[in-house]
UniProtKB/Swiss-Prot annotation:
Gene Ontology terms for molecular function: metal ion binding; ribonucleoside-diphosphate reductase activity, thioredoxin disulfide as acceptor
Residues bound to Fe cation 1: E64, E94, H97
Gene that produces this protein: RIR2
InterPro entries assigned: Ferritin-like_SF (IPR009078), HSV_RIR2 (IPR034715), RNR-like (IPR012348), RNR_small (IPR033909), RNR_small_AS (IPR030475), RNR_small_fam (IPR000358)
Name the UniProt record assigns to this protein: Ribonucleoside-diphosphate reductase small subunit
Function in brief: Ribonucleoside-diphosphate reductase holoenzyme provides the precursors necessary for viral DNA synthesis. Allows virus growth in non-dividing cells, as well as reactivation from latency in infected hosts. Catalyzes the biosynthesis of deoxyribonucleotides from the corresponding ribonucleotides.
């Protein structure tokens, strides 16, 4: 008879248990994102700005299906109650992200589903997006070992959306779209937690002899950063405050942070921009998440980069 251990819960990974509790403490819902003020701000955007953000939010709204990285398939590689519980929570949070992006897209497309679908069908053929997706799907197909799959998961969670989050956060600097900015804070912080989890998975659930060489991992991250910067560079011309040089610096600093987290030497040595608009960067938060509609997590984040 199979061991009954797999049916009866007992904590078997302190790190993932802590991450699950952190997710519980910081759970949020689409109803907490007020978008009524954002409607007039969207209408006031320049054509270049509106096109840029419509593109980003449509990409983000489709990302769960476009990226097609199956968390459940990954988790089946590990016989751990706490890992399975954490990733069940992560899937739930990703579903919330999808609902919020759908709400934001209603503003950008005047609540017209037909207009959104027509636009989505057009951008799915966009060369910058196609290159990004083709690179990812090619790499995912080549990832046959457990270690390689986790590294690709880490790329998706930690690098793949960073230029979009950074660009959206610039709206706060401009004093526009407060609901969108709040959602971006919540979602980017969730992704930071997801990156932390993927790093923990790599560090604690993969034997050292199974891991690729440092050089292979570094090459993968270098490719990912270059793909991401080309993606945003192709769309950023003429967009207010979007500085591709600063975004590259942030991407490189983020890649180095993740590499250090998985005990691989950093490759860029780039400091993040001094005036980084993503609020979790270098911040220290100790405010109860539910006291008010702000972007403070119950978890403290220090020296993120």
């Amino acid at each position: 008879m199979d061991s009954v251990d797999r049916f009866l819960y007992t904590s078997d990974h302190d790190g993932f248990l802590a991450l699950t509790r952190e997710t519980w403490q910081n759970r949020w819902f689409p109803s907490q994102i007020p978008l009524h003020l954002d409607v007039s701000h969207v209408h006031q955007l320049s054509d270049a700005d509106k096109d840029f953000y419509r593109f980003l939010f449509t990409f983000l709204g489709m990302a769960e299906r476009l990226v097609n990285f199956n968390i459940e398939d990954l988790v089946t590689n590990f016989n751990s109650h706490d890992v399975a519980h954490y990733y069940a929570e992560q899937v739930a949070m990703e579903n919330i992200h999808g609902v919020v992006y759908a709400n934001i897209l209603k503003i950008f497309f005047n609540n017209s589903r037909g207009e959104l679908l027509a636009y989505a069908a057009k951008i799915i053929l966009d060369p910058a997006l196609c290159e990004k997706l083709e690179w990812l799907h090619s790499r995912v197909r080549k990832a046959t070992t457990k270690a390689q799959k986790i590294l690709m998961f880490l790329i998706v969670e930690g690098i793949y959306f960073i230029s979009s989050f950074y660009s959206i956060s610039l709206c706060r600097v401009r004093g526009i779209m407060p609901g969108v900015c709040l959602a971006n804070d919540y979602i980017s912080r969730d992704e930071l937690l997801h990156t932390k989890a993927a790093s923990m998975l790599y560090n604690t659930m993969v034997e050292i002899q199974e891991k690729p060489s440092h050089a292979e991992v570094q090459a993968l991250f270098r490719e990912a950063v270059n793909i991401e910067i080309r993606f945003i560079q192709a769309k950023a011309a003429g967009v207010t405050l979007v500085n591709v040089v600063d975004i590259r610096r942030f991407l490189e600093a983020t890649a180095d942070r993740i590499l250090r987290d998985i005990f691989v030497p950093p490759i860029f040595g780039t400091p993040p921009p001094e005036a980084c608009p993503l609020s979790y960067t270098g911040s220290f938060k100790a405010v109860n998440f539910f006291e008010r509609d702000n972007s403070d997590y119950t978890t403290c984040v220090t020296d993120d980069l």
